[in-house]
Amino acid sequence: CIRDRHFVTLIAFDSTHYNQIYKNTAAAQAVDITAEQYQPCGGTPLYDAMGRAITELRAEVSPDDVVLVTIITDGYENASREYDCAAIRALVETMKEQNWVFTYIGANQDVEAVAKSMSINNHLTFETNDEDTAEMFRRENSCRMKFFGKINSVPAPELSANYFDDVDV
């Protein structure tokens, strides 16, 4: 079944870089990233990174593909030049109509308000210390596995409901 094939696109960004670490790479071939591949260095052009990534991904997937977009950031948007919140909200809403699922994970901000401003219902907060960051990734991984387990048995519009709920970590 085509829904059993999983691909990863991973983008690291800051105010000076937009780095596609993985672009539609088979999930089984994606390996842990290194510190050299991901070195945050200030500035969070979150809207620009989201707008560019969603637009690029939209051009590469089929309308019947299940797409899960997870945004992880340690700070508020503060450096975008091409997209604003309204444009991202419209883009997210358009893609949700095509059964894309969005999750937002953030630190050092009002995560619920930021996610809501972009029309993202599934959100998770973490603290930027080693223990909480590791716990956030454990929880996200557990939720992702639960999501993958539902892909073939749950209608696409229901996949986005309660992404971070009911998971034992």
Predicted regions and their residues:
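Acidic, low-complexity intrinsically disordered regions
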Residues: 2-169
